[in-house]
Amino acid sequence: MLNDIFFSVIIPNYNNSEWLPKSINSILKQTFSNYEIIIVDDCSTDNSIEIIKKYDKIKLIQCKNKAFNGGSRNIGLKKAQGQYVLFLDSDDWFYDENCFQKIYNTIIENNKPDCISLSYNCLIGNNQSFQSLIRNTPQILVSSVFVACWTKCIKKELIQFFPENTLMEDVVQHIAQCDKINTIVSINEPIIVWNRNNINSCSRIENQNLQKGKWQSSMYRYAADLMDLECEHSYCEEHRKWRLSVVLNNIKEGKYIQ
């Protein structure tokens, strides 16, 4: 029997109390109501938990130990019950109240594809600029410069887990994910608002910590994750090799990848 829940929205959070209500409310106001919200809080020290507990519809998971972005998303994935998974960072939000309906309509009209590529608006200061992500084949998707997991809506049964406690976990997961995707369609209008104004974003804080002295060991772990990745499709394997060559060259030259 098909799962009653259609979308699982997974949100990792760490100390994002300033933006969290906007992120949550952008989901709760959706006209399409068949979804679940899973927030994985990664040991926040602000009032994030207090904010989250005000909302009855949210499934809150509190990490006992730091899991970082990759680990938090994996925890959420293990609890997800929807047919499709959407990722959202806790300082970003959905563009308008019709986003879920647009994604759902695209899925139904295209015979339930494995993946839906989501375009977005980039917010810097008070200005939003539209970023179109037309990626209608796995070959185009895997070679995309922008690999953020929140730019893809994926069938739950095909979701690949993220490397944990490492740099560039989105990249490794992206390649592994593309290797499992056969059908993909794109939505050429904004679905997500990517907020570039948050100086306390999880990814930015993790990058700052790496720059303080842990970048080299994280680069080695990133390279190891790429080496361990096994790809069935040649286009994914070629992209894996290219990414690996870049990181190995940067390690050799002492360069930090951001």
Give names to the regions the model predicted.
Residues V85:
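Short aromatic/hydrophobic "clamp" motif used to bind/position activated sugar donors
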Residues M1, A148, D179, S186, ...:
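C-terminal subregions of glycosyltransferases and related glycan-biosynthesis enzymes
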Residues W19-P21, D46-K54:
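Acidic helix N-cap motif at the loop->helix transition within catalytic regions
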Residues S26, S33, D41-E50, N65, ...:
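A conserved acidic beta->alpha catalytic loop
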Residues R135-N209:
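Conserved nucleotide-sugar donor-binding catalytic segment
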Residues N15-K29:
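Short, well-formed alpha-helical segments that are part of the catalytic scaffolds
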